[in-house]
Amino acid sequence: DDKLEESIKVQLENRNIPKAYVDFIVLLAFKLKELSKLDAYLKNPTISYEDLETNSSLLTLTDPVPLSEAFKNRIIDLEGGRGVGKGEVAIVLFLRDAKIIGGRKDSDDAKGDVEIQSHAVEIKADKAQLVSFDIASYGSKPTAELKRIFGEDLEITSGTLWPNSVEQYYKNSEDKEEVLNLINKTIKTFYGGHSHVKAIKDSDLEQPSSLLTYLTDQLAISYLKGKNVLMLNTKTDNYILIESEEDYMTNRASGAIKILSFSDKFPRLTYNK
């Protein structure tokens, strides 16, 4: 058993799994009498990046892995400190050529939490922010700033999504052009110019909640450029792998990616399946 444990530890460390998790995984495999099965699987993992693309659940993705459900489910549920979120350990443990590459996200070049067969993947769980790093630190309660821009007569109902209050203000106003200019001033102030969110036109504001949708989608599309993002529903273990703007827009249109809140300057999204 000692040799097996050592062999497993080395393989897990090569995947950059933090030591606390390595010890837990070895202990779990020992308790479930699966050390030799785990060692054999780690030496020859069968699940590929293509399998990740074609599946939509961590449970079905790991179904072919020849280890007990008890073991697999505990690994899928692993999350905790040290910047490791749910799903990360499972993906790097069960997939071929996979390792954790996450850590401090100090620039938009930090493209992922995990790398699988040279594909970097960012993992986003519930209440995800799809917002570029260079503006993400601007998050704060926007009420005072909005009133400074639009005036005290802008009513922001507590508990609503503030873009809907701003949109209502626009629709009720007699000088729509003036309010549209103020909306674009807000976009510029909140999102660092127009590099992430393009200026909005009156034709973009015709549907209900169109400002909310516009801001959310523009921020997400800017963030997703050149990235692969896996959105995970931590309650169901279902996920969507977003590899393009089209993947994102299709899932937003179908309601699979849902806006949870917009309490500061940024939307929080969830994968709703």
Regions found by a protein language model. Name each.
Residues D1-K111, H119, K124-K273:
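Nucleic-acid endonuclease domains
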